[in-house]
Structures are given as structure tokens and as C-alpha cells.
Regions:
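Substrate-binding clefts and catalytic carboxylate motifs of secreted carbohydrate-active enzymes
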Residues: 56, 93-96, 106-257
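Active-site mouth of glycoside hydrolases
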Residues: 1-103, 108-110, 114-115, 238
Length: 257
């Protein structure tokens, strides 16, 4: 909402503003090109005056997806050409026409576009998920010196009060059907237990398990943030995934629903 940007202006917060394209491929028809040009123009004009606006980012994980995601790699080469046309030409042209001052970045992560090693740690921004998805230990953060880490994170369970809002007593087991439905990352409840077993003794009850998972999340995030802050100059910033939730769920959020 516009109120969000007003608050960021007042509080001195800088907004990394993604355009609404993420984790997908698009067939760039004439009609779609016309539609996105109008959408971008309208929204850039709506937000361009905000002091909090740090940059426009063309998309999330669409450039790097061609290197890492089998479902994207199997797509037609013509869709790859459409990606280049869309995010190297159509989208930046529309943004610059409406806002010539704010920096535009084609994709995240990226080394500058056109599929030029988007995960290069020496250029651009990187997303780092070996801690969590790769189940690497927290110490693995210390092996990486990104120029800017624009996404990393770690999951925890919500508070007991939140869990009670969507479960009955018989469901209060992290592998129950209800608890699994309130977890959208496959096998993630097991990942939390794996990391918990590496760092703590197993909690004696369900309430303590939820709480300890949050302590674990805090430890993971602190480890990464502390490492990259120590190397300021080489790494000039981080963004973590994520701050909050829009429904009661186990997730990467720091703030419970």
C-alpha cells in the first residue's frame, strides 16, 4: 500500500522494489508486452517520488532459474529469447521512461544480466540457500563473501498460540496432516528437526519444540549477518527472507502471524 512507502520515507528505510515477476517463464506476446508496459508505467509513476525507493528490480530468480531449475531448463529456447527481450529491453525501457533517476537491476540474483553467471560471488547480488535447503551447517556462511547477499533465510515454527488457532489438540505434532498443511516447503519440518538435533537436545514437549525452533532460527540468521557485517567493504549489504507471514504457518518469517 502507499502507506507502507510513506512510513519508510518517515523512518529512513530503503526499499528494494521488485516488479511483479518471479520464479517463472513468460511467453512475450504482443498483448502481454502491452499489458506489462502499462502496469509498469502506472506503478512506477505511483511510487517514483518516494525517498525510500532504493532501486527497481526486474524480477526474482528468473535469470538464475535457467541454470538451476529443471522445469525451467526444459522450456523452449524461444522463451529464453523472450526473457532477454522482456528484461533486457521492454521492462527497463518502461521503467526508465517513467523514472530516469532510480537505479534498475534486471534480476535477482544477477551479475548484470544476459545470463552472465548470475551466481558469481564477485559481481552483483547473490541468493544463498546452502544453509537450509542444502542442510549445510551454519559455519558454511563463513565460506562465502558475496558483494551483496539479497536473499537467505531459515525456518521456524510459529508460537503455540498461533498453532492453537488452526489445530485441535490431536493435531499438535509437527508431522500431523494439519501441521504439514501449514508448511509449504516440502520436507521442511524434518529440516528443522535435523538442524535442531545438530545444536540442541530434543525438547521434552511440543510447546518447547516450537520455542526452540525459533531460537535456532535466530542463531542461523545471526551467524550469517554477523559474518557479512564483519566483511563490510567486500559485502555491502544483506536482505533476509523473510520478515512476516500473511497466514498462520511454519516459515522463514521472523515475525509470527
Amino acid at each position: 500500500s502507499d502507506h507502507f512507502y510513506d512510513l519508510c520515507d518517515e523512518m529512513g528505510l530503503i526499499v528494494w522494489q521488485d516488479l511483479m515477476f518471479a520464479c517463472n517463464v513468460y511467453d512475450l506476446t504482443e498483448e502481454f508486452e502491452e499489458n506489462i508496459t502499462k502496469e509498469i508505467t502506472e506503478n512506477v509513476k505511483r511510487l517514483r517520488h518516494h525517498a525510500s525507493l532504493g532501486l527497481w528490480c526486474g524480477n526474482n530468480e528468473m535469470e538464475s532459474a535457467w541454470d538451476h531449475w529443471p522445469e525451467v531448463q526444459s522450456e523452449s529456447k524461444y522463451l529464453r529469447a523472450d526473457y532477454i527481450k522482456m528484461f533486457e529491453h521492454v521492462v527497463p525501457k518502461a521503467v526508465k521512461a517513467a523514472d530516469s533517476e532510480t537505479f534498475f537491476w534486471q534480476s535477482s540474483p544477477s551479475s548484470g544480466g544476459c545470463f552472465d553467471e548470475p551466481d558469481d560471488e564477485n559481481r552483483g547480488d547473490c541468493h544463498y540457500w546452502d544453509v537450509w535447503h542444502g542442510q549445510k551447517p551454519f559455519t558454511d556462511y563463513q565460506k562465502h563473501y558475496f558483494r551483496f547477499c539479497s536473499e537467505f533465510g531459515f525456518q521456524s515454527f510459529p508460537c503455540l498460540k498461533t498453532v492453537e488457532s488452526f489445530t485441535e489438540e490431536k493435531d499438535r505434532n509437527i508431522f500431523s496432516r494439519v501441521m504439514e498443511k501449514h508448511q509449504k516447503n516440502p520436507a521442511a519440518n524434518g529440516k528443522i528437526l535435523y538442524y535442531l538435533s545438530e545444536n540442541f537436545r530434543y525438547p521434552e514437549n511440543f510447546r518447547k519444540l516450537l520455542y526452540v525452533s525459533q531460537i535456532l532460527q535466530g542463531m542461523a540468521m545471526k551467524y550469517g549477518v554477523d559474518h557479512w557485517r564483519r566483511h563490510r567493504g567486500r559485502c555491502m549489504g544483506t536482505l533476509y527472507w523473510q520478515i512476516n507471514d500473511n497466514w498462520p504457518v511454519a516459515s522463514w518469517a521472523s515475525i509470527d502471524y
